[in-house]
Amino acid sequence: MLVIQSFRWDDKNYLELNSDIRKELRKNRVNADIRTFYLDCECYMAEEEEERMYNFIDTIRLWKPDLILVNDDQATYTLMKCGHPFVKKVPVVFSGVNFPNWDLLEKYPNVTGSWDKIDYKENLRLIDQQMGKSRIYINYDKTSLGQLAFRELIKAVDTSRYVLNYNQLAFQLNDPDFKVDSMTFRTEMRMKAIRPSKNVIHFMPFRKANGEFLLSNINGTYPYCVFFNIRYDYTSAGLSKMFVTPSFTAVREIFNINVEVLGGYFCSNRIQAAEQARLAAKILSGTPVSSVPIVESPKEYLYDWGEMQRLGISKEEVPTNVHIINMPISELGFLSPLPWA
């Protein structure tokens, strides 16, 4: 069995994900010789990336894996886009894909998987429930996946309860799509020290920001601010690590990798691996891929205990539907001393 991962081999997320994939395959009684290829997508332009994938697929034709497991948007898209004829000859199960390319998928009847549709609305509700009315900072970028994430987020926002603030895009990027007058901008700066009456979503061009702008917005100068990660790329972990204020995430990749992310509502590594292994086992047992429809991945609410400690959040302050990981045994609360201890 071939596993294709989108990012570098040393991506912190893969230590857990690769282990979970093996565990879940064993649970489904799939005893597989697993080989893993890391696309390292952040280091290549689109054409180079497709060529890299094509050349790699060329090397496995003689090995002929029974099935390919491919993870996340970049590797899934590039596997189909590279155009290697072998890709159409072997069953493929994708997982962790936030923005499926449906047009491309129609050309590959041998490809199925689980769609990790990001639930922005539920994550915003969680932030409001945990933090109260806040200024929610979101990294804005004009990459293809960045624009998809931006559009999906906008669709999910209830504008009767949230204010969408594009001011920094107008001033920092001189972006003609976003206009604001300087008086509005100055008023906003004066109001930053006051808790807003509505949640305010600030779209921040952190990729293009100068040092002064970046530092003034991440160092905790202004209260009632949180960082919300809406998708994953090479900037996500670094930004979350730099923010002094609480960080939430709508995707699994930067959770539980020691970059100071409190948590969120998303499809965890455990769920992703379980879904992928379940679909793989079904296909390997003889079910045609055409009879295995693409499904939407389940999600769960997760917080990291260590980050709760850093932020001074007690167990009693956490919503009851949130599962806390990395909690020491002494804090679990259900263990009582043995009668003979």
Describe the residue ranges of each PLM region:
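Short hydrophobic alpha-helices and adjacent helix-cap/hinge residues
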Residues: 2-341
